[in-house]
Swiss-Prot record:
Keyword list, A-Z: Amphibian defense peptide, Secreted
Protein's name in the database: Dahlein-5.3
Organism: Ranoidea dahlii (Dahl's aquatic frog)
Tissue: Expressed by the skin dorsal glands.
Taxonomy, superkingdom: Eukaryota
Compartments where located: Secreted
Keyword Disulfide bond: no
Protein function: Has no antimicrobial activity. Strongly inhibits the formation of NO by neuronal nitric oxide synthase at micromolar concentrations.
GO biological process, one term: defense response
Cellular compartments per GO CC: extracellular region
Amino acid sequence: GLLASLGKVLGGYLAEKLKP
């Protein structure tokens, strides 16, 4: 669903931001 897609995008964004 839309929320699942949004969560996936947000998770990827956070993962990139938290990468050293």
